[in-house]
């Protein structure tokens, strides 16, 4: 197996809401990513930890919201998260609760009947709709600006021939998808990213799909065709990832040669980030320590078959010398 790690770049596009100052936010994400890798393959975790420059954060949130939050708000909860080795019975029970199942049903109905969205009881859902509309309708040019924040490092990496893992969490997966579409169909950049990894993604929602760049087209411009592989991870209890089966919505990308594979991982996926409000199955920190996410990152880093690299039973392939 060839060691290509010197050209590996991990680009992370966060989800909505104000984030900590970029350096502090990056440190928190990096901590969680490495912890997830430690749990599936300590050797790979050590190798990646020795190359911190490989991890690039796209800090679009201050551009969009005009403010930042304090890193101290999340720090103790992230430390608690990283001291665990997986979800416990309470995490699983809460993720599978009838309350979550009922909320999911209501959101599915509203996704097909958008006029019902203002009637939903969860204010977080309403705010998410308002914020996504600001992005989709490019109010004050902000949509184009946040896509440019993603495209700028991607252009440089693609030109350098780097292997790119593009991770999009939540609304960040929408921005990443649209940025790839523009690189392909507007800028006509012929290069491809190696892996798109979407976490807690709303791309399965009809409301979102109707507003994606190119999605309504029925010609060769409908999808970005610069993604070698796509892995989507969706956790139980994450209501933002309303439909976890993205292959059913984007399967035409396979037929059109736009990507080599689309894999949905949602069976037995339980994130376990908690704060003072209880379990939050959607937070990016929880996804980064989760085993399905970590195995995808580890296998990509090595350019290896995932079953050989870091199988679920914990045995692992030795790092190349």
Report residues per predicted region.
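Low-complexity, serine/threonine/proline-enriched polar segments
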Residues: 81-116
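N-terminal accessory regions of S-adenosyl-L-methionine
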Residues: 60-62, 67-94
